[in-house]
């Protein structure tokens, strides 16, 4: 990382930082997932959900300004979901996304989590899954998955050690799947051969 940064908990009373996170969400997802947070009001709903009790919500600050945000929630058993993750597009490539993910992985493991689930969608023809009827052969489509645009986050997740574990057809609309990845963050178990 080229700039000094800090990662801190985002709380419900951090209004200035919440406003910065909302602006970051709207601007960052405009191309990759335009229907998800199209307005500041929609972004505020996402942030409010991530600030509920039992959730982890962390901001990465560069020069005192929000440069990224990550959240995680307990799903059930030892499974947690990382959602969302956003880094200012002008600051990508500096290791900030990795730093946020590693911070959340540490917190989840500390809370007893073993597996961390992350999802990424394809709503804009950036992978070979877009526009396909994935109900026909979802596992075959995953096996043959290709990334057409290096800006799609799938490669980022794989570089951080996340494994493809599934696909949810039409999750974001017809032909717009959710790609599911997971990583073991807790202690490794002993498995049968």
Tell where the protein language model's regions lie, with residue ranges.
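C-terminal/domain-terminus segments
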Residues: 70, 84, 166-193
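Conserved active-site tyrosine of GNAT-family acetyltransferases
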Residues: 157, 162
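Conserved beta-strand in the GNAT
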Residues: 59, 65-74, 81-86
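A short beta-loop-alpha structural element at the N-terminal edge
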Residues: 4-21
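Conserved acetyl-CoA binding element of GNAT-fold acetyltransferases
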Residues: 78-89, 119-121
């Amino acid at each position: 990382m080229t700039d000094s940064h800090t990662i801190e908990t985002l709380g419900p009373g951090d209004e200035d930082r919440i406003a910065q996170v909302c602006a970051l969400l709207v601007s960052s997802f405009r191309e990759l997932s335009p229907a998800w947070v199209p307005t500041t009001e929609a972004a505020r709903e996402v942030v409010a959900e991530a600030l509920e009790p039992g959730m982890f919500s962390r901001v990465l600050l560069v020069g005192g300004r929000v440069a990224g945000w990550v959240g995680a929630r307990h799903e059930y058993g030892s499974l947690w979901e990382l959602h969302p993750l956003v880094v200012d597009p002008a600051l990508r490539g500096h290791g900030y996304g990795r730093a946020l993910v590693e911070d959340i992985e540490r917190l989840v493991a500390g809370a007893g989590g073993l597996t961390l689930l992350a999802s990424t969608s394809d709503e804009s023809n950036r992978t070979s899954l877009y526009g396909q009827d994935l109900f026909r052969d979802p596992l075959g489509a995953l096996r043959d998955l290709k990334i057409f645009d290096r800006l799609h986050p799938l490669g980022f997740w794989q570089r951080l050690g996340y494994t493809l574990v599934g696909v949810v057809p039409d999750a974001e609309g017809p032909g717009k799947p959710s790609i599911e990845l997971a990583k073991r963050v807790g202690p490794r178990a002993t498995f049968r051969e």
